[in-house]
């Protein structure tokens, strides 16, 4: 077992920053656990908000953009905390990034970030999920649906099954899953549609400066933009050639 710990104190000047914490994952690692804890959680009537984004040696591995002052992430070959992708843990440099969405003026925020890596037999990785067949209603007309929804993969309490059941109960024709800054639930939601309910994926770009939806894809979209840049316009322009909606 390998353990590593980071800790620091932040002030309001550190609000709206991406703080990378780099660590090495050795070959043969079967499970990783990343724990973020911080205090104080509340300042007056407002909460501080620190979230996690994880990158493995190949790129984006998941994110947990949700409330609370304790975030525990487990990633293994066969399972992962919602918001993160299961699968092999490639050897090399990983990054646990703390996204400081809100740090209130006044009392500083102290955080600790603990990394625990365990060796062992590699669990089988879930097979890619095929997309469900499209809805039988494909002609022009009026359709009832929802372009914006969340699950336990970000900051909602409902599972994907519960979301889809609610959509059917309300008589929707289609629904898009758009969790905050992660795509970990998209394969599942797309596979669970049927002829009566079209299910599709997307992502809500929950930036420090505003929110936007990218609909129709499975790939993660880098939401880390700088104020005053044209990054959002570039994301929109890059979406259209891939038949995505922005």
How would you label these PLM feature ranges?
Residues 56-58, 119, 218:
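Solvent-exposed strand-loop boundary residues in beta-sheet-rich modules
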Residues 1-42, 114-121, 128, 132-140:
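Solvent-exposed, flexible loop/coil segments flanking beta-strands in beta-rich domains
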Residues 100-102, 117, 203:
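Surface-exposed loop/turn motifs at beta-strand-loop junctions within extracellular Ig-like
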Residues 18-21, 79-83:
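Short structured motifs
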Residues 131, 135-246:
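A metal-dependent hydrolase metal-coordination microenvironment
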Residues 2-14, 38-81:
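Surface-exposed beta-strand/loop patches in noncatalytic accessory domains
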Residues 46, 104-117:
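Edge beta-strands of jelly-roll/beta-sandwich modules across compartments, strongly enriched
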Residues 28-36, 85-110:
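Noncatalytic modules at the cell exterior or secretory-pathway interfaces
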């Amino acid at each position: 077992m390998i353990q590593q710990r980071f800790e620091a104190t932040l002030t309001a000047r550190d609000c709206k920053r991406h703080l990378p914490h780099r660590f090495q994952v050795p070959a043969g690692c079967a499970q990783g656990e990343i724990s973020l804890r911080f205090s104080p959680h509340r300042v007056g009537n407002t909460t501080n908000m620190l979230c996690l984004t994880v990158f493995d040696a190949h790129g984006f591995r998941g994110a947990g953009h949700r409330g609370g002052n304790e975030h525990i992430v487990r990633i293994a070959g066969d399972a992962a905390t919602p918001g993160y992708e299961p699968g092999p843990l490639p050897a090399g440099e990983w990054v646990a990034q703390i996204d400081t969405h809100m740090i209130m003026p006044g009392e500083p925020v102290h955080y600790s970030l603990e990394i625990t890596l365990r060796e062992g037999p590699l669990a089988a990785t879930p097979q890619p999920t095929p997309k469900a067949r499209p809805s039988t209603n494909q002609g022009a007309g009026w359709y009832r649906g929802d372009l914006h929804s969340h699950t336990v993969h970000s900051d909602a309490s409902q599972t994907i099954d519960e979301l889809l059941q609610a959509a059917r109960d309300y008589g929707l024709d289609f629904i898009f899953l758009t969790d905050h800054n992660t795509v970990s639930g998209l394969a599942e939601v797309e596979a669970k549609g049927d002829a009566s309910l079209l299910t599709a994926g997307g992502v809500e770009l929950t930036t420090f400066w505003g929110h936007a939806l990218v609909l129709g894809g499975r790939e993660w979209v880098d939401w880390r933009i700088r104020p005053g840049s044209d990054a959002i316009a570039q994301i929109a322009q890059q979406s259209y050639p891939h038949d995505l909606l922005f």
